[in-house]
Amino acid sequence: MELPSGPGPERLFDSHRLPGDCFLLLVLLLYAPVGFCLLVLRLFLGIHVFLVSCALPDSVLRRFVVRTMCAVLGLVARQEDSGLRDHSVRVLISNHVTPFDHNIVNLLTTCSTPLLNSPPSFVCWSRGFMEMNGRGELVESLKRFCASTRLPPTPLLLFPEEEATNGREGLLRFSSWPFSIQDVVQPLTLQVQRPLVSVTVSDASWVSELLWSLFVPFTVYQVRWLRPVHRQLGEANEEFALRVQQLVAKELGQTGTRLTPADKAEHMKRQRHPRLRPQSAQSSFPPSPGPSPDVQLATLAQRVKEVLPHVPLGVIQRDLAKTGCVDLTITNLLEGAVAFMPEDITKGTQSLPTASASKFPSSGPVTPQPTALTFAKSSWARQESLQERKQALYEYARRRFTERRAQEAD
């Protein structure tokens, strides 16, 4: 079974909390005073909810009381097809939308969820996670947990996506390790709805997600139970995971993708450090109609090549494609930001300084060329000589490029 390409990471993860629609933004501004009052009030109520959940033993009464109090906090939990819940199944599989998915499911049925990539701590326990010693022996520990004979049995709630999505477009690729614990799992689907703002943001912390949950009027969590799924004869963990992923995606009306948590991390990295195009790049590339981008790039690369003839043309074009600016590319090449193997310069090319000085006269003194190659005795002297030669070459290249642009302007 092959996964479809599906939507890209920009559609699976929301980068902005506030709505883009002007009307919704206006409504949010008008609601803000009420939201702040609700936030303060719910913070005090939330402390009582936490204390009650810690004081009462795990039972139907505790889940009913805490579920009612959470509804006052604006966290509404609903479920469909609860009759399909098989209490003999020890592994529950769900898609992941918010940092509080496990808390919501725990209001509906008893379950435990391990916290991945985090050491045991008070925060881990207070958030309702099961404390594990480490991920190195995670699978073996969970197998022993499921094999225990304690009554009543506590199932595991696992999120094979390992990272939360916006819950609208598609699912991340399911990891195979949750499907190596037992040969039967029970999937469930989780849909989250919230007015005015996004349900979750890709780079937000769980604290900010909690504050936004208390700020908005309500957040509705809809849980739908599916029938248990058994491993087929000779089916590998990866195939089992893929089959369950497609089943969950079909029930949600979404697409199962090949994207992994690493793709989410790369997407967030690109969002935090976008490639900036300097203003000079806009003047270097004339607006359409005009030459094609390849012709423009070749023209700019030729300009840099005339200033720095010892730099390969391919290196110049690659850096220009990133910067879009002749000045910035020259600076990168002179300062060593771009590695390259210098080309052999012919005699005609070596005489360029003299020719350019007579063809493009300047008011300032001619930049002296590097002296004959000598090897200084001390490392300090060699470093100083290198810096002087680099500065001289840099000043010469800048002057030659400026004179050429002035002549083109005339």
From Swiss-Prot:
Effect of R42I: Abolishes lipid droplet localization
Posttranslational modification: Monoubiquitinated and diubiquitinated.
A single cellular component GO annotation: autophagosome
Consequence when changing K390A: Abolishes interaction with UBE2G2
Residues on Cytoplasmic side: 1-20, 42-410
GO molecular function per UniProt: ubiquitin binding; ubiquitin conjugating enzyme binding; ubiquitin protein ligase binding
Effect of D58I: Does not affect lipid droplet localization
Induction: (Microbial infection) By Dengue virus infection (at protein level).
Membrane topology: Peripheral membrane protein
Tissue-level expression: Detected in blood platelets and leukocytes (at protein level). Ubiquitous. Highly expressed in placenta, liver, kidney, skeletal muscle, heart and brain.
A biological process term (GO) from this entry: retrograde protein transport, ER to cytosol
Disulfide pattern: none
Region feature (Disordered): 255-295, 350-369
Subcellular location: Endoplasmic reticulum membrane; Lipid droplet; Cytoplasmic vesicle, Autophagosome
PTM sites of type N-acetylmethionine: M1
Domain comment quoted from the record: The CUE domain is required for interaction with the ER quality control machinery and misfolded substrates, ubiquitination, lipid clustering and interaction with AMFR but is not required for localization to lipid droplets.
Family: Belongs to the AUP1 family.
Described purpose of this protein according to its UniProt entry: Plays a role in the translocation of terminally misfolded proteins from the endoplasmic reticulum lumen to the cytoplasm and their degradation by the proteasome. Plays a role in lipid droplet formation. Induces lipid droplet clustering. Recruits ubiquitin-conjugating enzyme UBE2G2 to lipid droplets which facilitates its interaction with ubiquitin ligases AMFR/gp78 and RNF139/TRC8, leading to sterol-induced ubiquitination of HMGCR and its subsequent proteasomal degradation. Also required for the degradation of INSIG1, SREBF1 and SREBF2. (Microbial infection) Following Dengue virus infection, required for induction of lipophagy which facilitates production of virus progeny particles.
Name recorded for this polypeptide: Lipid droplet-regulating VLDL assembly factor AUP1
Organism: Homo sapiens (Human)
